[in-house]
Amino acid sequence: MTDLLSRAHADALDAADPLRSLRDAFVFPQHGDRDQTYLVGNSLGLQPRAARAMVDEVLDQWGTLGVEGHFTGPTQWLTYHQLVRDALARVVGAQPGEVVAMNTLSVNLHLMMASFYRPTHERGAILIEAGAFPSDRHAVESQLRLRGLDPATHLIEVEADEPNGTLSMAAIADAIAQHGPRLALVLWPGIQYRTGQAFDLAEIVRLARAQGAAVGCDLAHAVGNIPLTLHDDGVDFAVWCNYKYLNAGPGAVGGCFVHERHANSDLPRIAGWWGHEQQTRFRMDPQFVPSPGAEGWQLSNPPVLALAPLRASLTLFDQAGMAALRAKSERLTGHLEQLIRARVPQVLQIVTPAEPMHRGCQLSLRVAGGRAQGRSLFEHLHAAGVLGDWREPDVIRIAPVPLYNRFSDLHTFVGQVEAWAAA
């Protein structure tokens, strides 16, 4: 083993890491007398230490002010959702008026499709990737059926064309060109949840808009993971969850982006009173006057207690900056790839693309010997306090998150793989 693959080298990298102090801003689950080796921030991010104080602040305001907390106090609930707006916009590469924290991902996807999926007799198809996250597929199929359309004829899936189960841009481009005259909407992920493949959203937008289709994105595995430029890319809408890389807690409030070209449009929408312009909302007029931008798609008043942990996490993103986080992420995941290829190549096959521009922090791994061996390794890791996650039928996902993971965590993971293989 070369020095570059030694734990001593990893410890040196950790000592030189300019972001190392951010780890102390999170609460780690324990395994015996030590922190878990937590490599599953792609499923649920860790709790920011500041989250408890920010939740307590809301509880204290509720206890002392009651309903008046909507309009008075240190953080008025009427505008609490706007406390996370600017930081969210920086994370996704948007203008502040293009983003809002509301609802959850699947709810927001339905709201966006109600506005942006406008099928006609000639143009009614929706294009997605084969193997999309099930909730996305459920949403798409139900939207088609709500319009009286058959998913068998109006849902187009782009099949993986690479040996590792990923998609080439050529395959995506060919599908958009082939079905272009029929396409009403292209719904695409920033990162595919099972394989960890990242996509060139700007190019997908260019191809789809050239065919006259709208473009929406599911950014569940991209937001807070890779730099995004939604405004410049020209995406019509995007939705995401905030409980993975944005560390806002289980079942956290979601996020939504609507490009500013739609800010004052007359697009049909499913409306609610919190989407009404703020200045006249409490007049209780019967006519709906939408707030400009993404806030005009809000339905009900924001879940303030759920927004508080997101606010705590976004403070850390502003402190670090997405560029620095991405630079560390590329080094972490690159080091993990090196370790796997050097020490356990006979055990683990890397599904995720090798090029940093085509992945985020996650590596999706298949275990030699098939599903039974994969489950055996996964359970061994869990028992040893090394947490990744499992996605059927046969993938272990490992995600070194730059906010709180260390290079030495990757040695712990690979060391446990070696121990399992030797048993």
UniProtKB/Swiss-Prot annotation:
Record GO terms (molecular function): kynureninase activity; pyridoxal phosphate binding
SUPFAM superfamilies the record matches: PLP-dependent transferases
The UniProt record lists the keyword Plastid: no
Gene Ontology cellular component annotations, sorted alphabetically: cytoplasm
Pfam family, one: KYNU_C
Residue positions, PTM N6-(pyridoxal phosphate)lysine: K244
Cofactor names: pyridoxal 5'-phosphate
Role according to the record: Catalyzes the cleavage of L-kynurenine (L-Kyn) and L-3-hydroxykynurenine (L-3OHKyn) into anthranilic acid (AA) and 3-hydroxyanthranilic acid (3-OHAA), respectively.
HAMAP family: Kynureninase (MF_01970)
Subunit structure: Homodimer.
Record protein name field: Kynureninase
The organism of origin for this protein: Xanthomonas oryzae pv. oryzae (strain KACC10331 / KXO85)
Lineage: Bacteria, Pseudomonadati, Pseudomonadota, Gammaproteobacteria, Lysobacterales
